From Swiss-Prot:
Record-given protein name: Type VI secretion system spike protein VgrG1
GO CC terms of this entry: extracellular region
Function of the molecule: Part of the type VI secretion system specialized secretion system, which delivers several virulence factors in both prokaryotic and eukaryotic cells during infection. Acts directly as an secreted effector with an actin ADP-ribosyltransferase activity that disrupts the host actin cytoskeleton, leading to a decrease in host cell viability and an increase in apoptosis.
Domain of life: Bacteria
Name of the gene: vgrG1
Keyword set, alphabetical order: Glycosyltransferase, Nucleotidyltransferase, Secreted, Transferase
Species whose genome carries this gene: Aeromonas hydrophila subsp. hydrophila (strain ATCC 7966 / DSM 30187 / BCRC 13018 / CCUG 14551 / JCM 1027 / KCTC 2358 / NCIMB 9240 / NCTC 8049)
Family (UniProt): Belongs to the VgrG protein family.
Length: 743
């Protein structure tokens, strides 16, 4: 029952009758971006109330004035204690908090991907059975590609995420329930009562009033600049600035600069810079107020009137408030006979100001830092062995991620550190699915992992047994979707030093200039099939024809060749042989020497032709013919040989895969055989591609990187030969000088 002041406080707990408890006093703390905290001092005629009927049960405090409800607060009992017992009453103490408080009881590690902030917040609320919430968002909030809750309570994560996105939240109350409202602009605030400023000569019957208003201004950062970096746009600054307002009473040179800004896109950068500025200046213009209006709560505005300082008679919003009430008559045994009283004290800012929580404050804890590197497994979709994107990034499964499925959805694309990384040069070794990697975090940020190392474990063993092969340095790969491997191995054991190379299929080597081998002992080459070697033409300097390639061989000792089948040697011009002593040739059946013009045999002392018992000998003493019969012009036929049946060597075509192995050079002359410099040409290559240009000063053109096959070249003669007679023009011909598939 209300006393003479008209005030009364009542409480209802769980399913207990409303008469179970009477309120002796209460203290209620509320603030933006914080769960409220209600402490109740109660008395009851029951000395043995069942704790199970109270703890974690709904509780509602009602504040009445002259029988009219002024304020209600609904929540759940988080703490219940029994105090002193007397003859009639037993004292109890309750702590009541909103359902959101339950999020502080669960700490977790998890990953959210490609979700908007409000979607992430909804997931967390619903997992705790909270369905009465709303989003009053004015601004667009981009999806977060990768957002990690790392060793945080769900409540800390909600508060931090909301603050990073410039959101704030407050509670609204209805009969038996309360709603959480998330907002990002002051326009979402609820308009509250009009309160007059009471100089002390007016009573409560004239309406709720403000009895104290302390106004304050403070110097705060004047502007904010944030900067970040994205590997997708490395040359772009990603810098954003925001300038504060209401700087008339302070300097405008107090800039707050920070890196990284925790964003990768311009829209987010602009918003985050504004959020940071609003948070840093959230108390630059503020007030501390005392009143008797129980209806006030965070997320609400009120209008102040009748203050002697007319500039303060405007709209204000409440950012935090403490309500206190005492009902002494509830404590009969302690002689409680004073009046029921209520008052509050609260902090305010301008109603037009969008209040945002400052990171690092009780309303918005700092983002947790990862203390050091972590272990993770490379993952990907079923059936894949290597899974990466165009940047060589991979997907990871962290041991602490209980929600991941060890597939391509387990994480965002994570960058991989390589030993060397330049513009289309450097090293590249993609971690494969199932590999264990070491993951570091840029600035300790769990949202920015990067693979910095790889490790073996009990399942993924090293290429060779250890420590038996501890002197080996090995680079071994594994055939993708097949069996086999490539390997480069260094053996450093004294006396057994070795460089070993194993290729599962082909070896292609391209040296743009010279290659030199110095082997100080033996060289053994074992080829199971065929060997094809070519010493080819070398492109000349600009405008010069190519030079011929030569093969030089010097053997200080013997050279022994054993060819078990045929041996074919083709020399397009001349073959010169010079022997220091003897030339000894033995054929099992036939030696056939044939010349297109002449054969000359010249000896310093003797030439002998011998067949069976017959011979012809030419020496310094004359010509000797010996045989059973000497025939001169006696008929018969000359003997014949088998003729040349050698084979040309195989071409290197297709054996070397190089982007610079084929070129084509051509030139064009007039009827006087003078070069036609500057003549436009059009070359249609064998693959249908077209090259166009003009001939150089020598009437020549060189095309590189051309496909093998036949090409056609036509010339635009219209302007070039305008001063020549028709007869000369018709006599002109185009010459395809050389089409070479050699580079």
């Amino acid at each position: 029952m209300a006393d003479s002041t008209g005030l009364q406080f009542t409480v209802k707990v769980g399913a207990l009758p409303e008469s179970t408890f009477v309120v002796a006093e209460f203290a209620l703390d509320e603030a933006l971006n914080r769960p409220f905290n209600l402490r109740l001092e109660l008395a009851s005629a029951q000395p043995d109330i069942d704790f199970g009927a109270v703890l974690d049960q709904p509780c509602e405090l009602l504040v009445w004035y002259n029988g009219e409800l002024q304020r209600r607060v609904c929540g759940v009992v988080s703490d219940f204690a029994q105090g002193d017992s007397g003859f009639r009453r037993t004292r109890y103490q309750l702590m009541v908090q909103p359902a959101l408080w339950r999020l502080s009881l669960r700490q977790n590690c998890r990953i959210f991907q490609a979700q908007k902030p409000d979607e992430i917040l909804s997931i967390l609320l619903q997992e705790h059975g909270i369905t009465d919430y709303a989003f009053a968002l004015k601004n667009e909030h981009a999806k977060r590609e990768y957002c990690v809750q790392y060793r945080e309570t769900d409540l800390d994560f909600v508060n931090r995420l909301a603050a990073e996105e410039g959101m704030f939240y407050f509670h609204e109350f209805e009969a038996g329930k309360h709603r959480i409202v998330f907002a990002d602009d002051a326009a979402a605030l609820t308009a509250g009562p009009e309160l007059f400023f009471n100089l002390g000569n007016r009573s409560l019957e004239q309406g709720p009033y403000v009895r104290q208003f302390h106004y304050r201004e403070a110097v705060r950062p004047s502007d904010v600049e944030l900067k970040d970096y994205s590997c997708k746009t490395p040359a772009y600054g990603l810098s954003h600035k925001k300038q504060g307002s209401e700087l008339e009473h302070q300097r405008d040179t107090y800039q707050h600069f920070d890196y990284p800004g925790r964003y990768k896109q311009d829209p987010s950068g602009k918003a985050f810079a504004q959020h940071r500025l609003d948070a840093l200046r959230n108390d630059a213009v503020a007030g501390q107020v005392k009143s008797n209006c129980a209806a006030l709560l965070p997320g609400q505005t009120f209008s102040l009137t009748e203050h002697p300082n007319g500039s303060l008679n405007t709209d204000w919003q409440i950012v935090r408030i403490r309500h206190t009430g005492e009902q002494p008559q509830a404590l009969e045994e302690e002689g409680g006979s004073g009046p029921t009283v209520y008052h509050n004290e609260f902090g305010v800012v301008k109603a037009s100001t969008t209040w945002r929580a400052r990171i690092g404050s009780p309303e918005a804890p700092h983002k947790p830092m990862v203390d050091g590197p972590q272990i993770a497994m490379v993952v990907g979709p079923d059936g894949e062995e290597i899974y990466c994107d165009e940047h060589g990034r991979v997907k990871l499964q962290f041991p602490w991620d209980r929600y991941g499925s060890s597939n391509d959805q387990s994480s965002c694309w994570v960058r991989v550190s390589q030993g060397w990384a330049g513009g289309q040069y450097g090293m590249m070794a993609i971690p494969r699915i199932g590999h264990e990697v070491i993951v570091s975090f840029l600035e300790g940020d769990p949202d920015q992992p990067i693979v910095t190392g790889r490790t073996y474990h009990a399942t993924n063993r090293p290429p060779y047994e250890l420590p038996a092969n501890k002197t080996r340095t090995v680079l071994r790969t594994e055939t993708h979707q097949g069996e086999g491997f490539n390997e480069l191995r260094f053996e450093d054991q004294a006396g057994q030093e070795e460089i070993y190379i194993h290729g599962q299929k082909d070896l292609n080597v391209l040296i743009e200039n010279d290659a030199a081998w110095h082997i100080k002992h033996d060289q053994h080459t074992d080829i199971d099939n065929e060997r094809v070697t070519r010493v080819r033409k070398v492109p000349g300097e600009e405008g010069a024809p190519p030079s011929l390639g030569n093969d030089h061989l010097t053997v200080e000792g013997e050279k022994r060749d054993h060819i078990k089948a045929d041996y074919s040697l083709t020399v397009d011009t001349s073959m010169h042989q010079k022997l220091g002593q003897s030339w000894l040739t033995q054929a099992g059946q036939e030696v056939h020497v044939k010349a297109g013009a002449k054969v000359v045999l010249e000896a310093g002392s003797e030439i002998t032709v011998k067949v069976g018992g017959c011979f012809i000998k030419v020496d310094g003493g004359g010509v000797t013919l010996v045989g059973p019969t000497i025939k001169m012009n006696s008929g018969g036929n000359a003997g014949s040989g088998s003729g040349w049946a050698g084979k040309v060597p195989k071409s290197m075509e297709g054996m070397l895969d190089s982007p610079h192995t084929r070129w084509m050079k051509f030139y064009h002359l007039d009827s006087e055989l003078m070069p036609l410099a500057g003549t436009p040409y059009k070359a249609v290559l064998s693959d249908g591609s077209v090259r166009e240009g003009t001939l150089d000063g020598e009437g020549m053109a060189l095309l590189e990187d051309v496909p093998a096959g036949t090409a056609s070249v036509t010339y635009d003669l219209q302007d070039t030969f305008a001063d020549l007679p028709r007869e000369s023009i018709s006599a002109l011909t185009g010459h395809l000088d050389s089409l070479s598939d050699e580079g």
